[in-house]
């Protein structure tokens, strides 16, 4: 049997081969769940009479020094900012009520939310006590689209804990985080390859 023609394999790269008819990989579906005004919201759940009062959680309210760690929605209406000195917050809103932090209570609520997230995926990355990234790519066949999963999580969180979530849904962590910041409180924002320029390009640089 005569040998066949010689072939040049000098440029052969096995990693560049594609299966015939194969489709490009699909985007992952990443959620970023952010518990709204977490510390202040927990305090108002434990003390319902505070719900409609401007409240800020801080380090040492007795000595009236330190900074604002968290504030509720009524306090936000007065322009209270996280991280600002208590004296500045008091000047903006003389009626504001400063509360001490209760870390054990915050941890308990945070764990409740983690258990809720695990109903939908085990691909969870904590981003602080009140924020998580969830990769729900493998859960879409069971629970629907990323938006549907985010909305179900928000509804379940409110029903079981009283807390609200702002959720961002996107194809990477950066955009999902920006999605959860885009609309608050208690909202879902989808940032896709089709709309990310429309939603994000007009934002101020400090929001990026």
Locations of regions flagged by a protein language model:
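Gly/Gly-Pro- and Ser/Thr-rich, intrinsically disordered tail segments characteristic of DNA damage-repair
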Residues: 1-208
